[in-house]
Amino acid sequence: MLGKKISLSIKKAFGITMSLAIGLSAMTAPVLADNEAKLKLPVGKVKRTAAPVYDCSPDLLLIMPNAQADNDEVSDLLKEAKGELVGTMGEGRLKCLIYKTEKGHMADTEKKFMKDKEHFKYISRNYRFRAQVVPNDPRFTSEWHLGAINAPKAWDTTMGNHTKVAIFDTGCQASISDLAGKTMKGYDATTVGARLTVLGGPGPIGDLLGGLGGALSEGAQKDVQGHGTLVATTAAATANNKIDTAGVAPGARVYPVQIAGENGMTDDIAIMAGLLNMMASGNKIVNISYAAPPPVGFTNALLHAPLHVYMQTFHDLEGGLIFLSSGNDGMFDPCPPTHYVNVVSAIGPDLKLTDFSNWGLPVTFTAPGKGIVCTARDGKIKSVDGTSFSSPIVASIAALVWNANPGLPNVAVESILKASCFKAGSAPWTPYYGFGMPDAAKAVKMAKFGM
């Protein structure tokens, strides 16, 4: 019954009409709480789209069988297709088969299995994604983003001490000053040993296997590419340590989850494995600064159906929050929104949508994403651009909110973030900024003293 509800919810998301979203997307906005700036609607923004580019693992399918399907019949169908079952993730509602098709026959096999509704519930390819960072010049701006979201005023109440933020990325360089002493062992979803976690879903068996997988994992305290440390220090760099940076939640702990290697690429399987580790380890806040050009990105619940089952389970049943960068293609995303993923676009110091930020129907929030000062894995200060950095800013505001009131359910944290937002008009939502840019100080006050 539970799996049926999740299935219906995903299907309902596709019934949301374009006209409803556009009807909510006009107008102009209230003044920011502690300054006189406003979010500005972009002028002449065109819904730029392009032909989808499907980058995926060759000859690999992710298959979620129907709960009522006979296991022997499913096994026979897989054998008849002349492929190989190379792995299984999760159990029960999260059971997902990793299937290697006959070489060159992925599309045919996918089409055949998708027609068989009796045995197969969801099928997708294992898509690959890149980190969402934009090259920037070496000129450093001030940490304007902290003032824009009223972080310093929020710190009068809480700095997020000990609240955990999971950074799904290339690992985090725990040895640098800004992350030393606060970066947990974490989890490496890219190794065979660590992927023991994928053998079990939530529950006693999943917890046991998750603990075993975590113990065998070497963790993710080394950044193999560099992107993860930039994201982690944006979120939670230590303050008052004689380094010229501070994270949005400087007291928070970082739980690194390595989902990408030296090439900076990740895929559905790695993220699903990471989410299973979240369920086993009790982590509640996840940031994923990866995307692909619309409509192929993570926001597409149809293309990434198994992954979306995992994300919705983490949100609805485990009480977690997921923050996802909208992407850096400067394109319109037509994918309908989902209640279990918070998609974040990027604005610049002019409080206007950046040229590179994707925007569209799935956007939930916006945050600064241009000229963000953070720390690289070599300990040097960098100024960076990208929705890779707007997403962890909102995730870290959520950490401040949860630290101010640990008893809040995840949906209450989301409601507070939305209610606190600086907007770009009287409309409650726009396709550029979603519900707006969360005000950290206002959100923390709401969490502490009520709406």
For the regions a language model picked out, list residue spans one by one.
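N-terminal secretory signal peptides that target proteins for export/translocation
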Residues: 1-9
